[in-house]
From Swiss-Prot:
Keywords: Disulfide bond, Mitochondrion
SUPFAM superfamilies: Cysteine alpha-hairpin motif (SSF47072)
Family: Belongs to the CHCHD7 family.
Principal localisation: mitochondrion
Protein name: Coiled-coil-helix-coiled-coil-helix domain-containing protein 7
Gene Ontology biological-process entries: mitochondrial respiratory chain complex assembly
Motif (Cx9C motif 2): 36-46
Species the sequence originates in: Xenopus laevis (African clawed frog)
Cellular component per GO, a single term: mitochondrial intermembrane space
Positions of the CHCH domain: 12-54
Alphabetized InterPro entries for the sequence: COX23, Cys_alpha_HP_mot_SF
Compartment(s): Mitochondrion intermembrane space
Gene: chchd7
Length: 84
């Protein structure tokens, strides 16, 4: 699978919504980054959160390291609020 296709795949990219929101903000604001800072922070926090999950699963020997989309949904539902 190509890198671009993998980044658009919900199973491979847990932060697809945040990616799309950041891109949309940039498009709507003529690429003025300072107007989209909150979107960038949310994306960065999303990547940090799922990277931590991947590291934990790798340490525990759980395969695949990145949970599938359905499993990620269950993980987020088990938390009281969105961690990012």
């Amino acid at each position: 699978m190509s890198r671009i296709r993998r980044m658009r795949d919900l199973d491979s990219n847990p932060c697809l919504e945040e990616t799309d929101a950041s891109t949309k903000c940039m498009d709507e604001n003529q690429y003025q980054k300072d107007l989209c800072t909150s979107y960038f922070i949310k994306y960065k926090n999303c990547r940090k959160f799922w990277n931590g999950i991947m590291i934990t699963r790798r340490r525990e020997g759980t395969v695949p390291y990145m949970p599938a989309a359905e499993e990620r949904k269950q993980i987020l539902e088990s938390l009281e609020s969105l961690p990012y």
